[in-house]
């Protein structure tokens, strides 16, 4: 909402006003659709429309796009009024989304951990939502108590972030590395983060999952090419 320190809608709308692109995309948390934000949501959409854009809004789930994480996000797409083609959101029904264990098996076993297979069997669901950093969520860890309990069910210690994968004789509940967190967020395995651990985890946790962004971007491009 208007009072949230993380609200970047005013800046994003300012950029649209100054640059007047053919299309723009915005994303926000699922709570943006809550009834208590109806007035603010309409204010944002009307502000975009007043700049000469048609607006589209939809809730997309990252796990429908192959991301092994529960991450629903509201995606707003604005198409300039002179573009006549109609924008369509991607379907995103991906039945091949891996579990956390399947996605992280190679990274978690990088140091020959003897307990790997048992862990993979336990981590047989998608991950809870990865959090970034703010005054409410510091780092590096995997979120508040309720989130850590969800991670614990997957055999993951959410109280911190490890520097490397478990050793061969490791006994206990492993922590994720920043590379593992990035993979769960949908980043390619070759992607590197030059920052220190806390800053890197904050960037990763605040990111919009790349596979979802790509899918929406492809549909925006299709709309612009067909106009």
Map each language-model feature to its residues.
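C-terminal target-recognition/interaction regions appended to catalytic cores
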Residues: 108-227
């Amino acid at each position: 909402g208007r009072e949230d320190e993380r609200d970047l809608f005013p800046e994003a709308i300012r950029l649209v006003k100054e640059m007047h692109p053919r299309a723009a995309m915005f994303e926000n948390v699922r709570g943006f659709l809550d009834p208590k934000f109806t007035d603010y949501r309409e204010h944002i959409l009307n502000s975009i429309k007043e700049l000469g854009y048609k607006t589209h809004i939809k809730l997309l789930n990252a796990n429908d796009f192959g991301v092994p994480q529960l991450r629903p996000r509201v995606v707003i797409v604005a198409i300039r009024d002179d573009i006549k083609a109609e924008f369509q959101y991607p379907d995103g029904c991906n039945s091949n989304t891996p579990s956390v264990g399947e996605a992280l098996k190679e990274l978690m076993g990088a140091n020959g951990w003897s307990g790997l297979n048992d862990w993979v069997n336990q981590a047989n669901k998608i991950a809870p939502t990865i959090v970034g950093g703010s005054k409410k969520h510091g780092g590096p860890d995997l979120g508040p108590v309720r989130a850590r309990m969800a991670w614990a069910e997957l055999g993951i210690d959410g109280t911190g972030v490890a520097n490397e994968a478990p050793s061969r004789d490791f006994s206990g509940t492993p922590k994720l590395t920043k590379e593992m967190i990035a993979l769960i967020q949908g980043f390619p395995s070759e992607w590197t983060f030059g920052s220190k651990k806390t800053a890197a985890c904050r960037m990763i946790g605040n990111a919009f999952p790349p596979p979802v962004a790509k899918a929406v971007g492809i549909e925006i491009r299709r709309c612009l090419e067909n106009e």
